[in-house]
């Protein structure tokens, strides 16, 4: 089993546990260039989302080297998704890291979302 298959397996296990609880989750996906965060309801509908691919985020990150793929950009995405969730009336979520290690950009999204008022 290679690294990608292992990550996908871990992600499936996490999603299965969250699905049993029927709670809203904050799902994070990471690529080399961007990071994506979505608030997903128990019925698999996306309630709020933010990413470094959004035009508003790109404007805020303009001028930085590696603008979409760094910890500062991930923190901005975490803050934005938390603000959108709170505006939609969502205060508590389960964190779905999609099999990625809780380190670096994934950790930055989670910590920024917590600081912005989202409870895990």
Swiss-Prot record:
Signal peptide range equals none
Keywords attached to this Swiss-Prot or TrEMBL record, sorted alphabetically, are: Ribonucleoprotein, Ribosomal protein, RNA-binding, rRNA-binding
Q: Which Gene3D superfamilies match?
A: 3.30.420.100
Give the transmembrane region(s): none
User: What Pfam families does the annotation carry?
Assistant: Ribosomal_L18p (PF00861)
PANTHER family from the UniProt entry: 39S RIBOSOMAL PROTEIN L18, MITOCHONDRIAL (PTHR12899), LARGE RIBOSOMAL SUBUNIT PROTEIN UL18M (PTHR12899:SF3)
NCBIfam families per the UniProt record, alphabetical? L18_bact
Task: Give the protein's recorded name.
Answer: Large ribosomal subunit protein uL18
